[in-house]
Amino acid sequence: MEKFAPVAALLLLLLCFPVAFSGHDYGQALSKSLLFFEAQRSGVLPRNQRVTWRSHSGLTDGKSSGVNLVGGYYDAGDNVKFGLPMAFTVTMMAWSVIEYGNQLQANGELGNSIDAIKWGTDYFIKAHPEPNVLYGEVGDGNTDHYCWQRPEEMTTDRKAYRIDPSNPGSDLAGETAAAMAAASIVFRRSNPVYSRLLLTHAYQLFDFADKYRGKYDSSITVAQKYYRSVSGYNDELLWAAAWLYQASNNQFYLDYLGRNGDAMGGTGWSMTEFGWDVKYAGVQTLVAKFLMQGKAGRHAPVFRKYQEKADSFMCSLLGKSSRNIQKTPGGLIFRQRWNNMQFVTSASFLTTVYSDYLTSSRSNLRCAAGNVAPSQLLSFAKSQVDYILGDNPRATSYMVGYGNNFPQRVHHRGSSIVSVKVDRTFVTCRGGYATWFSRKGSDPNLLTGAIVGGPDAYDNFADRRDNYEQTEPATYNNAPLLGVLARLSSGHSGYSQFLPVVPAPVVRRPMPIRRPKVTTPVRASGPVAIVQKITSSWVSKGRTYYRYSTTVINKSSRPLKSLNLSIKNLYGPIWGLSRSGNSFGLPSWMHSLPSGKSLEFVYIHSTTPANVAVSSYTLA
């Protein structure tokens, strides 16, 4: 018996401590991963910018289109601002804060996480100047990729591309609505005014996406080569509805998920991926959460089908399904050669939250091979993160700056060229390729926290700057990892939401919402007529809000060259007009209103309609 004493002592020692996720410093990895977002910032950098080799950039974005589009994030190693992956990035960062805010706070990174989210949502507010207009890209991938320049001095085309009713993009508008709705939950306590503003934009964007349907890359065709919408837009409409329900507790969005789950593929597709294009697995995970929380009501049969598909996705990751996801010999899930790591981090996030959802509801995962304990999902997520951080056949960390063996030649313009703060010598478009891209040496600027594309199907990796499939990072690689790292850093301390779940809706036939009377439905001033109507209403925190659509009609036989409106008793945001002091006029993009045509603008507030009157006008 004595020879087993050391083993017994070791076991006793282990039992004295909670089983922690040892081996890697997840808190350090979390802190580094947030720095990457600061390296990707576009616009005027704040004074507390911690990535000091970066400087201001993209300061005229949107100017040629008459809109301010300064800010936001560069998506990867280039200098283009792509709206669809940027919105997904913000949605996933917000989801991380919603579920793991306590853990982020314990690591001292909650504030930095919220700042990273706001950097994105501030930009989306600018990119959504009217209810049915959304700017979805700044810059052109073709011309941008022709050059290798620092973002601070790029000479490439900065044209802005938008979607509108004539050129729709339901996937882009839907994902942006999801991002705004999720972020509104994050700011609900710390900045309630900003939270309400984000939710207002989310409502508008969802309406736009749902009413004017179409794929965004059919309207913004320059995006097709880089971020083609292969899955279409039905997944984004369901995704946006799920986030709007979580943010507003509005029964309409729960009903939308229930009514459209079958027709839009939410209950039909068993997924093997989740990312910026395909959102079904994320939708299924969220709807399963609503079901576990007892919120499904009459939609429970449909929501159970959503959950079956969520279970199927999780089981395929664990190798316990009839259709399992491919893994490398070293155990990393593998989807494709180009930037495979995006699917690793996003799947790891879903398994992490699903493990906690199941644990909270005292449920098990149902797989074809039998029931599986939720802890196995969390262990799977840990295995993927550990692989990223260095537990792999190459002993390589795929997070730049973490560990001793990480990529040194990242496919990234900003990090591969000496900082403009160190050497202000202008780097020309093609000269950047000759001088900096082709260098064999390490990057002059450390892109701390960046998750690169990662190894191939056989765990092989080539640390070369021209190997963009493996060495290029992306914001949507890092975003899902925030929540996973925060959760793993807490060990087995348990699942604890930072923000309370909204109360479950009362399952009964809702009373009709009383709408205020529009006392002056038609108001005319000479040849200009004004018609106001309520198009929607909702309740938030006990207060009813109304969306007013106001139509200005040119009844004359000549074009309306200029118009000044007086709007009194307006207590909320307004879209569709240009503003100068207390006067409102035609939007900047409209030079005149033709005879017989109309202009619509929208405002939202929680009382009777504003008093809209014509102050002056000029006919051509």
From Swiss-Prot:
Gene3D superfamilies in the cross-refs: 1.50.10.10
One Pfam family recorded for the sequence: CBM49
Top-level taxonomic group: Eukaryota
Catalytic activity: Endohydrolysis of (1->4)-beta-D-glucosidic linkages in cellulose, lichenin and cereal beta-D-glucans
Enzyme Commission code(s) on record: 3.2.1.4
Family: Belongs to the glycosyl hydrolase 9 (cellulase E) family.
MF term (GO), any: cellulase activity
SMART domains, alphabetized: CBM49
Main location: secreted
List of glycosylated residues: 554, 564
Enzyme class: hydrolase
Active site per database record: 78, 411, 463, 472
GO cellular-component term (any): extracellular region
UniProt-annotated location(s): Secreted
Native source species: Arabidopsis thaliana
Tagged with keyword Flavoprotein: no
The entry's keywords: Carbohydrate metabolism, Cell wall biogenesis/degradation, Cellulose degradation, Glycoprotein, Glycosidase, Hydrolase, Polysaccharide degradation, Secreted, Signal
GO biological process, one term: cellulose catabolic process
Signal peptide, first to last residue: 1-22
Name of the featured protein: Endoglucanase 6
Tagged with keyword Secreted: yes
